[in-house]
Amino acid sequence: MSLKKSPFFELRSGSVDTLLFTVKTTDLDALRTELVKRFEATPEFFADDVVAIDVRRLADGERVALADIRQMLNDVRMRPVGVVALATQGWAGEAGLPLLEARDRRTPAAKHADEAEPAPAPVVEAAAAPAAESAQEPAPTLLHAGGRTLVIDRPLRSGQQIYAKGDLVVLAPVSHGAEIIAEGNIHIYAPLRGRALAGVHGNHDARIFCTCLEPELISIAGIYRTTENPLPAEVLGKSVQIRLEEEKLMIEPLRLT
């Protein structure tokens, strides 16, 4: 077999970011009702996002019909790509979806908060699929800056994504549908109308600073808030800082004078 590199495709190991849909009940009727309720306010928010079904929170001996959950997610326009399960949950491989291994980006000491919701933070290990380079669609803007501070001085349009391994500084507007992600702090000296996720590897000390807060989503270390829960008038469109306090997002006016 020839080992010559093909100009048309390649196979290599890689990491793919997905949402984790964590199942905590075997009551599928209740799950469906809650899912529809959650998405009816913002039906386009997670449209076409890939998601892995996580069943690790189920009790020993419990199991669910993954095919039904897969259909539920399809019904709200999400795209299930696999299942994350414990080694003892052998039934999880019966749904026709591949079993995936997830690395939780939250720190081991972090607790699950009942009143909070996990942000799209896990990394799922998978092999990259073969692709013809000539047929690829333009990818969203995706930048890394090692562990250094990354500075962005141009507007971010819908569909663009920025990822910083350290802190992230944005000097131009972040439009609806754009996403900025950092393992450290995020500073936005312009309107934030898209998504901002700080401390994505479980850094509970990370903060978000913004001079005009009008976001679709804000998140720190896996705790997030969307427009489903409207922001109060004293912070909407204002200069703010966002931090975590006991697993809750605190949004506070930023006094600049």
Swiss-Prot record:
InterPro entries: CAP/MinC_C, MinC, MinC_C_sf, MinC_N, Septum_form_inhib_MinC_C. One of its GO terms (biological process) is division septum assembly. The keyword Lyase does not apply. It holds the Pfam family MinC_N. Keywords: Cell cycle, Cell division, Septation. Signal peptide: none annotated. Cell division inhibitor that blocks the formation of polar Z ring septums. Rapidly oscillates between the poles of the cell to destabilize FtsZ filaments that have formed before they mature into polar Z rings. Prevents FtsZ polymerization. Belongs to the MinC family. HAMAP family: MinC. NCBIfam families: minC. Interacts with MinD and FtsZ. This is Probable septum site-determining protein MinC. It comes from Burkholderia lata (strain ATCC 17760 / DSM 23089 / LMG 22485 / NCIMB 9086 / R18194 / 383).
